[in-house]
A protein has these predicted regions:
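Short beta-strand
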Residues: 35-38, 74, 100-102
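Conserved beta-strand in the GNAT
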Residues: 55-57, 121
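Core segments of cupin and vicinal oxygen chelate
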Residues: 14-53
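A short, acidic/glycine-rich surface segment
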Residues: 41-42, 61-66, 130-132
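Vicinal oxygen chelate
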Residues: 1-4, 7-16, 44-47, 65-145, ...
């Protein structure tokens, strides 16, 4: 099986005003607030045609600043396949990355920063991967939040 980075999966926005942001995506764009994994931080997922395309993270109760290098857009995500191959590629190139499994889900992720500091999230459906074990390692602190 080869390596492929597919279509845009979703984008993530860190906000200090979750309610107004949810309202905008519902009222203005017509998205629907829907199910979200039980992450350790508050937020909301907004759906289009049954797909969570906008992830919102509430940072209003933290001292966490909005990243100046990416503004309110935190990362860009792509549906992908070839999890092990991508990890090998990143390691061969000497690139720091973070891999993890979504809590309670069948989704594996790799996070890596582009040369401009934009975080790229690569999502892999575990059932479609030919690897024996779920991701557990952490390479540097690229992180999703």
């Amino acid at each position: 099986m080869g390596i492929s980075v597919g279509v845009l999966d979703h984008f993530n926005i860190r906000t200090r005003n979750l309610a107004d942001t949810v309202r905008f995506y519902e009222d203005i764009l017509g998205l629907e607030k829907g199910a979200r994994p039980n992450f350790a931080f508050p937020g909301a997922w907004m759906y289009s045609e049954g797909k969570a395309v906008v992830h919102l993270v509430d940072i209003s109760r933290t001292e966490e600043p909005q990243k100046p290098d990416s503004g309110v857009v935190h990362h860009v995500a792509f549906a992908s396949y070839g999890f092990d191959g991508m990890k090998r590629r990143l390691e061969t190139k000497g690139m720091a990355y973070d891999s993890r499994q979504v809590p309670g889900g069948d989704l594996w992720q790799i996070f890596v920063n582009d040369p401009n500091g934009v975080m790229i999230e690569l999502n892999y459906e575990a059932a479609k991967e030919q690897t024996a074990a779920a991701p557990s390692e952490r390479r540097d602190d690229v992180g999703a939040r």
